[in-house]
Amino acid sequence: MNALSEQILFELRHLLSEMSDGGSVGPSVYDTARALQFGGNVTGRQDAYAWLLAQQQADGGWGSADFPLFRHAPTWAALLALQRADPLPGAADAVQAATRFLERQADPYAHAVPEDAPIGAELILPQLCGEAASLLGGVAFPRHPALLPLRQACLVKLGAVATLPSGHPLLHSWEAWGTWPTAACPDDDGSIGISPAATAAWRAHAVTQGSTPQVGRADAYLQAASRATRSGIEGVVPNVWPINVFEPCWSLYTLHLAGLFAHPALDEAVRVIVAQLDARLGVRGLGPALHFAADADDTAVALCVLRLAGRDPAVDALRHFEIGELFVTFPGERNASVSTNIHALHALRLLGKPAAGTSAYVEANRNPHGLWDNEKWHVSWLYPTAHAVAALAQGKPQWRDERALAALLQAQRDDGGWGAGRASTFEETAYALFALHVMDGSEEPTGRRRIAQAVARALEWMLARHAAPALPQMPLWIGKELYCPIRVVRVAELAGLWLALRWGPRVPAEGAGAAP
């Protein structure tokens, strides 16, 4: 084993051993801006405001120009926060640039709601528009009319409930609809819906009503969430936190995709996480965090991980989310998630359960090229494609898909990487390699040579970029805006590099295409 392989295993082991701190998530423009706005005084928060200003793009908006659908919430939120920070150098100019940006934007919600709309868009965007309207007067910015009936319907439902239980999914967007702090209660971590923005909004309302002990818990949560960004700037917070189920689940699942799940060098760290997941999985399943509502996606991936570790978890926890032959991520979901059903399919096949309907749904949701690109939790088509290939091949050693393979190889960029935006990313290149890893096992020699050539080009690209970045460069995960679960992404990057380094004549991937 060469030095780089040893280095990869060392870093993976270190990442896995850190996963008891609630998780690591990159900084969020939207949540930071909302927390600053709800926090009151600008004094003492200049560093966070400076960070917010530094994230503004040259066109006046916030968020990646590659993915315009996810720019509205951070831009609205930043504009509103900076509007009241006028004395700060650059704030007034930033507000003017943001206003011009919004005036130029086409409204993606003019007539319908896109399938991959950000989390809580129907509640958040109309609320932000309403706040901005009182500040900007007659500015002709997008009004998002298709979201208004959805928001109204949601508010009617919320109006019929005095208090939502801790961890309810709608609490994640409390900042967009909540006004009475008694209608929500901080969870055991001190958060409202594992959301810094929601918690900051709740805290601001609670302060006015004298809920001092609860305010202290919210403050402690916001400080811990800020540390989780690794930005080193007090007041800069992530889009979601904690993620103490999602982070370990997805990391171990990724190790499986790369054939690393059972690697002896990672055995102890994997066993610790598996034992924790086994103890936490109840009859209702698991959510992204211990104190958040269970969902089908986290439950399915947890079942996969436990079965891969030799446990025999009950499938009943997943059945709660089954409606007909589909799995909803959570009750009341606006539109079905392809990746949730991909993960459910993988879990069912690993557990030896019938899955014909789910398999048919996954197959039916390909694009004309045979890939999967209509995903609501990740902006890149490479994420659901890698996971779909693994799920469809599970238990079927001879599974082949020439159409998907051809499309995947054709999508490789001239530089050797893959990416859904204007540039290749390490994360997405790793997903491409995971898919090729599964496909390679059942290919004819000619196909394997084509795959090997693509992997060699990818390896050259990856070797020039494998050092860990100080902060995530390209958030690709869909929340209220695009965000980056730092460790989850880094595990994927390292696992992809490991695969590329060790490509060549080999046995099929650990667990890929074989029964457990």
From Swiss-Prot:
* MF (Gene Ontology): magnesium ion binding; terpene synthase activity
- Where do the PFTB repeats start and stop? 45-86, 401-443
Q: Spell out the PANTHER family in the cross-references.
A: (E,E)-GERANYLLINALOOL SYNTHASE (PTHR31739:SF25), ENT-COPALYL DIPHOSPHATE SYNTHASE, CHLOROPLASTIC (PTHR31739)
What is the protein name stated in its UniProt record? Answer: Uncharacterized protein y4kT
Q: Which Gene3D superfamilies match?
A: 1.50.10.160, 1.50.10.20
Q: Name one GO biological process term.
A: diterpenoid biosynthetic process
Q: Which UniProt keywords apply?
A: Plasmid, Repeat
Q: Which InterPro entries match?
A: Terpene_synthase-like, Terpenoid_cyclase/PrenylTrfase
Which organism does this record belong to? Sinorhizobium fredii (strain NBRC 101917 / NGR234)
